[in-house]
Amino acid sequence: MKKAVINGEQIRSISDLHQTLKKELALPEYYGENLDALWDCLTGWVEYPLVLEWRQFEQSKQLTENGAESVLQVFREAKAEGCDITIILS
């Protein structure tokens, strides 16, 4: 089981968030750092099962002007489509 940890205290922008996702999920170099690219990777690249632990989510949400909420929604949609993702927010 793969575990990806996002530390919200270290996320200062949506770019920081995408770079963290790229590292934690071992996304390809050509990852486009946008919601469509994230969806493509979640539904065709990432190995499952996956545990996403997002620490200090509310802080990262504020610092990314709700960009973090949009990213979280992509993970929730991928889960609804059958991707084996466990999401832990703290």
UniProtKB/Swiss-Prot annotation:
Disulfide-bonded cysteines: none
Keywords: Cytoplasm
This protein's record includes keyword Cytoplasm: yes
Localization of this protein: Cytoplasm
Signal peptide: none
Top-level taxon of the source organism: Bacteria
Main location group: cytoplasm
Pfam name, any one: Barstar
GO cellular component terms listed in the entry, alphabetical order: cytoplasm
Family of this protein: Belongs to the barstar family.
Function: Inhibitor of the ribonuclease barnase. Forms a one-to-one non-covalent complex.
Name this protein carries in UniProt: Barstar
Organism: Bacillus amyloliquefaciens
